[in-house]
């Protein structure tokens, strides 16, 4: 096991934009990973201009950028992850941590943690569909309401794929 300390930049909406990530890397040196503020899969339209600016490969040159996906639908996650892979991204991140009320009430972000059966099905579907194609990491909270929820969350995907 590699015990080297890794440094990652978490996304902060409207702060850690592509311009900020590039300036940070140039001034302070590159971190190991930069997580891009979340994208949501769109079925009926292309990316918003702001989203497109964040994921354009030329805006993420010379850094290891990881797009973050916010959804509770495996089909949308899989489709978006494959599109991001085609753009050159090696890894995507599932956002299970966002505490925003508008996100949580839709069962996304940390709101998805309250539905362990659905979450387990979702995780199985995305890991099975994307195995060997793109790396998937997960940003989560230790529970939706209580830290005691964490052990059960860990059991959802305890086997390594």
What name fits each language-model region?
Residues 40-45, 96-116:
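Glycine-rich, proline-tolerant flexible connector loops at the mouths of alpha/beta enzymes
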Residues 7-10, 34-36, 65-69, 92-94, ...:
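Hydrophobic faces of well-ordered beta-strands that scaffold small-molecule active sites
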Residues 14, 75-76, 135, 140-154:
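Active-site glycine- and acidic-residue-rich loops that bind
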Residues 21, 81-82, 116-127, 150-155:
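Generic structural signal for well-ordered alpha-helices
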Residues 160-161:
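Conserved small/polar residues in nucleotide/adenosyl-binding loops
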Residues 55-66, 110-137:
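Alpha-helix-loop-beta-strand connector modules within alpha/beta enzyme cores
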Residues 12-83:
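Glycine-rich, positively charged N-terminal anion/phosphate-binding segment
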Residues 66-89, 111-121, 147:
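Glycine-rich anion/phosphate-binding loops
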């Amino acid at each position: 096991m590699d015990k080297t300390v890794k440094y990652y930049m978490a996304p902060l909406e409207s702060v850690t934009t592509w311009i900020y990530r590039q300036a940070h890397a140039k001034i302070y040196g590159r971190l190991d990973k930069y997580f891009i503020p979340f994208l949501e899969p769109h079925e009926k339209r292309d990316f918003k201009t702001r989203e497109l600016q964040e994921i354009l490969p030329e805006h993420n040159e010379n850094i290891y950028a990881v797009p973050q996906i916010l959804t509770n639908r495996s089909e949308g996650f899989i489709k978006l992850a494959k599109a991001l892979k085609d753009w050159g991204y090696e890894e995507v991140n599932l956002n299970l941590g966002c505490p925003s009320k508008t996100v949580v009430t839709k069962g996304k972000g940390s709101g998805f943690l309250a539905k362990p059966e659905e979450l387990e099905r979702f995780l199985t579907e995305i890991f099975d569909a994307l195995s060997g194609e793109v790396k998937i990491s997960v940003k989560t909270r230790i529970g939706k309401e209580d830290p005691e929820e964490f052990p059960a969350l860990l059991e959802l995907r305890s086997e390594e794929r």
